Amino acid sequence: MEINEKLLRQIIEDVLSEMQTSDKPVSFRASTAASAPQAAAAQGDSFLTEIGEAKQGQQQDEVIIAVGPAFGLSQTVNIVGIPHKNILREVIAGIEEEGIKARVIRCFKSSDVAFVAVEGNRLSGSGISIGIQSKGTTVIHQQGLPPLSNLELFPQAPLLTLETYRQIGKNAARYAKRESPQPVPTLNDQMARPKYQAKSAILHIKETKYVVTGKNPQELRVAL
C-alpha cells in the first residue's frame, strides 16, 4: 500500500503537536528511569494506588490485570482518548461477571505488552493474565507460554472499544475456569496502522521512560 508522503508528514506533525506537554526530553539513562515513576505519580490519576509489592496468588479463581509502567500515571488515556479508568472498569466487570476475581498490578521491567503480561501470569493464581499497555494494546496470556505466544492478542488499540475490553475480561475469566471460549471479535481497519503509527511510536517511547530495570511489580488498589 502506497502512503502519500505529504499526508504522512502531516500526520506526524499533528501527532507531535498533540503530544507536546511539559514532559522532560526522552532519556533512557538509568538514573532518569529509576526516578520517573515517583515523579509521574504526582501527575497521575488518583484512581490507582500502589500498596506494596505484588505477591504470588494462591487462589485459582483470579485473573491478574498487569498494566504498563506509565499506565494511570504520565498517561491516563489510550491512543484514541479512552480513559484508563474506564478501560479497567470494563475489564474488571467482564472478569467478575464470570465469577472470577480481578487483581491489578503495575509492571516496571518492560514496556512491551507481552512481557508485562508474562509478569502478570507468573503471579496469577490461575496462571491467566491480561496485559495492557498505556496506549491500549492488550493481550490475554497464560503461564508457561513464551512471551511472544498468547491466548489472544489485540494489537490494533485504536479499534478497541469499551465493550471489547469487557469481552476481553470475560474471556480471560473463562480461560481461568479452564474453558475454551471463542476469541473476542474485533474490528479490522487497514488504515489504522498508517494513521496511528507515529502516535503509537511516541506513546511507546513515553512509556519506556518509566521502565525501571529490576523493580518488581506493585499491587494496585483501584478506585472506580
UniProtKB/Swiss-Prot annotation:
Which Pfam family, just one, is annotated for this protein? Dehydratase_MU
How is the protein put to use in biotechnology? Answer: Ethanogenic BMCs can be made in E.coli by targeting pyruvate decarboxylase (pdc) and alcohol dehydrogenase (adh) to them. PduP(1-18)-Pdc and PduD(1-18)-Adh strains targeted to the BMC (PduA, PduB, PduJ, PduK, PduN, PduU) make significantly more ethanol than strains where Pdc and Adh are not targeted to the BMC.
Q: Please list which residues make up the signal peptide.
A: none
Q: What is its EC number?
A: 4.2.1.28
Gene3D superfamilies linked? B12-dependent dehydatase associated subunit (3.40.50.10150)
Cellular compartments per GO CC = bacterial microcompartment
- One example GO MF annotation: cobalamin binding
Q: Which GO annotations describe the biological process of this protein?
A: propanediol catabolic process
Q: Where in the cell is it found?
A: Bacterial microcompartment
Catalyses which reaction(s): propane-1,2-diol = propanal + H2O
Q: Does the keyword Disulfide bond apply?
A: no
Tell me the keywords, alphabetical order. Bacterial microcompartment, Cobalamin, Cobalt, Lyase
Q: Region annotation Targets protein to the BMC: residue ranges?
A: 1-18
Q: Cite the annotated pathway.
A: Polyol metabolism; 1,2-propanediol degradation
Binding partners and assembly? The propanediol dehydratase enzyme is a heterotrimeric complex composed of a large (PduC), a medium (PduD) and a small (PduE) subunit.
Role this protein plays = Part of the PduCDE complex that catalyzes the dehydration of 1,2-propanediol (1,2-PD) to propionaldehyde. This subunit is directly targeted to the bacterial microcompartment (BMC). Expression of a cosmid containing the full 21-gene pdu operon in E.coli allows E.coli to grow on 1,2-propanediol (1,2-PD) with the appearance of BMCs in its cytoplasm.
Record family assignment = Belongs to the diol/glycerol dehydratase medium subunit family.
What's in the domain note? The N-terminal 18 residues form an alpha-helix which targets this enzyme and foreign proteins (tested with alcohol dehydrogenase) to the BMC.
Query: What is the recorded name of this protein?
Result: Propanediol dehydratase medium subunit
Q: Which gene encodes it?
A: pduD
